[in-house]
Swiss-Prot record:
Protein name per the record: Dual-specificity RNA methyltransferase RlmN
Positions of the catalytic residues: E93 (proton acceptor), C343 (s-methylcysteine intermediate)
Record's GO cellular component terms: cytoplasm
Organism of derivation: Francisella tularensis subsp. holarctica (strain FTNF002-00 / FTA)
Positions that bind S-adenosyl-L-methionine: G167, E168, S199, S221, L222, H223, N300
NCBIfam families: rRNA_mod_RlmN
Family annotation (Pfam families): Radical_SAM (PF04055), RlmN_N (PF21016)
Length: 370
């Protein structure tokens, strides 16, 4: 029985070196191939011109470099790009957001999500499976190749990665960490730990593991300073409450790359956007002595949600109070809403746990017909 070929795309530098040793080849050959794949975007062994003929033949026999198919890509009028990527009959989305001086790629880690946060459209679509390391890094590979070919008024260079797409990345730790290793490898994409940010809803034990094994920048989806409300809107809080979460955050801030934690706070009208909520948030972060930046995210409504986006006045009042109390506070701009790429809209039109396959196939058929 023929052994399955190893997909080299998802192997970090150590893993690809180990693979080359296992087939009787040298580590420096592994580094050559690693660079061809990620730095140069080459996935055909025959096109890797500095490899010997025998090595290329061996690789074709033992390995492959498989890139998922892009079902479609869209560009927004504001420069935002969105890709729908086929991952074995299901689909995930990847979004690139250009800003002055930077370009941020939002990467997915799971097909669906297990956490079922009450305000998140992805969580309402159910959970299929974790992405492999190859499927995670493929999102950056595809974006880097696509954007390098795009001309226009925007700068299409990926300078930052945020693991904030579909899924809870710390629930797919074993695949996300190797993928982030590749993102930060100088032979690949060369991003620093400060430029790669993982966003978690609060899988506390894995926060400690992340600090030990990766140390990328950390963002935490807090959304409320109140355990009672957080139990309702972020159910994982029932397992790891705010006190436990902030204890982990405090240590991460001390040893991580930024010396602070970014707290994400989705503002929902009359749910968590009152001045009393802002007061409680300030008191909480100051009492726990967690160095913090706060990113306010106005809620993006989707069909069937009971939540509403606050008025601009309520958003401004909340922000002003936090800033007045010494916290660097930003309000996330809605980007790519004309292509359903804004935060909270990821894959909402293609991921449905009752008819995911049918909707995906219809989308694929519509794309092929164009």
């Amino acid at each position: 029985m023929q052994q399955d070929k190893v997909n080299l795309l998802g192997l970090n530098q150590k893993a690809i070196e180990d693979f080359f040793i296992s087939i009787g080849k040298k580590k420096f050959h592994a580094r050559q191939v690693f660079k061809w794949i990620h730095k140069k975007g080459v996935i055909d062994f025959d096109a890797m011109t500095d490899l010997g003929k025998n090595l290329r033949h061996k690789l074709k026999d033992k390995a492959q470099i498989t890139i998922p198919k892009v079902v479609f890509s869209k560009a927004s009028k504001d420069g935002t790009h969105k890709w729908l990527i086929d991952v074995g009959g299901s689909a995930v989305e990847t979004v690139f957001i250009p800003e002055e001086g930077r370009g941020t790629l939002c990467v997915s880690s799971q097909i669906g999500c297990t956490l079922n946060c009450s305000f998140c459209s992805t969580g309402k679509q159910g959970f299929n499976r974790n992405l492999s390391a190859a499927e995670v890094i493929a999102q950056l590979w595809i974006a880097a190749r696509t954007l390098s070919k795009t001309d226009g008024e925007h700068d299409f260079t990926v300078t930052n990665i945020v693991m904030m797409g579909m899924g809870e990345p710390l629930m797919n730790f074993e695949n996300v960490v190797p993928a982030m290793d590749i993102m930060m490898d100088d032979l690949a994409y060369g991003l620093s730990r400060r430029k790669v940010t993982l966003s978690t809803s609060g899988v506390v034990p894995r926060i400690y593991d992340l600090l030990e094994q990766s140390g990328v920048s950390l963002a935490v989806s807090l959304h409320t300073p109140n355990d009672m409300l957080r139990n309702e809107i972020v159910p994982i809080n029932k397992k790891y409450n705010i006190d436990e979460l902030l204890e982990a955050c405090k240590l991460y801030a001390q040893k991580g790359p930024h010396k602070h934690i970014t707290f994400e706070y989705t503002l929902m009208e009359e749910v968590n956007d009152n001045l009393s909520d802002a007061e409680e948030l300030v008191a909480l972060l100051k009492s726990r002595e967690v160095p913090a930046k706060i990113n306010l995210i106005p809620f993006n409504p989707y069909p069937g949600t009971p939540y509403k986006k606050p008025s601009n006045n309520r958003i401004h009042r909340f922000k002003e109070f936090l800033q007045h109390n010494g916290f660097v506070t930003t309000v996330r701009k809605t980007r790519g809403d004309d292509i359903d790429a804004a935060c909270g809209q990821l894959a909402g039109d293609v991921m449905d746990k009752t008819n995911r396959k049918q909707i995906y196939l219809k989308k694929l058929g519509d794309t092929n017909a164009n």
